[in-house]
């Protein structure tokens, strides 16, 4: 059985993160400020308003745009709450204010794993505790409905939002990448100890075929598992210096993947 080097990572960090709650200190336009510990840039969450001892509601989405670990100060980017959509019911028209509370990593107990084969999938899901794993069969069914045999970033975002999934794990190039599924920001990486021998496209699932739309982005079938996910992660984390150095060390300084980064040497 494949062994994954996760021992030290399972005990701390975002892999088993509990919700982080902090009051808003300041709100200016579409941004708010909090003071909190164990925060990572890219973490997503919600803004909650409490009306009384028994009544509260979510009024906005939020994700960490900047974080200063020296003083714990985080700047949140605010956006419309879109996890529950029901056009037939009235919705609130509240503006976020300093008396509200930010709840980050609220969905980090649920995760989706993109793996190349069943052996890798079973090993990782059994190695990481405290996570409710959403089976990739469900995601493959969603992609078939959309007609996208090649999953797009927007497909991950919408599926995770609709199903309250906070973390996306992607195993590629002998590395386990942990991303916030809603912001697609890389949170953590862990190396594996064994090279993959086989891979399914677009990922391991028990769904034999994902329906393809006639045309449009995502309608083409994925030819190769590994390059696609490495590129997708790089494109959406182009300013991540640690990811840039990881790619450079793993694939050489002439790798085509490095062109996706906005990093100055």
Please report, for each region that a protein language model flagged, where it lies by residue.
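Sec-dependent N-terminal signal peptides
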Residues: 4-13
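Surface-exposed, polar/charged interaction patches used for macromolecular assembly or partner binding
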Residues: 17-265
């Amino acid at each position: 059985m494949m062994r994954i080097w996760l021992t030290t990572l399972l005990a701390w960090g975002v892999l088993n993160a509990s919700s982080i709650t902090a009051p808003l200190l300041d709100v200016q336009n579409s941004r708010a400020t909090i003071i909190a510990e164990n925060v990572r840039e890219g973490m997503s969450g919600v803004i909650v308003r409490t009306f009384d001892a028994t009544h509260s509601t979510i009024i906005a989405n939020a994700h960490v745009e900047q974080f200063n670990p020296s003083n714990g100060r985080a700047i949140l980017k605010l956006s419309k709450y879109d996890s529950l959509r029901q056009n037939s019911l009235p919705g609130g028209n509240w503006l976020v204010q300093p008396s509200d509370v930010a709840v980050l990593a609220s969905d980090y107990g649920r995760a989706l794993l993109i793996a190349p084969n069943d052996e890798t999938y079973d090993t990782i899901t059994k190695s990481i505790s405290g996570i409710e794993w959403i089976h990739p069969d469900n995601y493959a069914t969603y992609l078939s409905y959309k007609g996208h045999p090649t999953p797009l970033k927007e497909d991950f975002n919408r599926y995770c939002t609709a199903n309250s999934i906070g973390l996306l794990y992607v195993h590629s190039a002998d590395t386990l990448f942990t991303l916030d599924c809603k912001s697609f920001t890389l949170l953590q990486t862990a190396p594996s100890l064994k090279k993959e021998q086989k891979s399914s496209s677009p990922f391991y699932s028990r769904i034999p075929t994902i329906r393809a739309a006639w045309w449009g982005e995502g309608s083409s079938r994925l030819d190769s598992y590994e390059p696609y996910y490495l590129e997708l992660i790089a494109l959406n984390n182009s300013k991540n210096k640690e990811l840039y150095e990881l790619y450079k060390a793993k694939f050489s300084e002439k790798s085509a993947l490095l062109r996706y980064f906005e990093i100055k040497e």
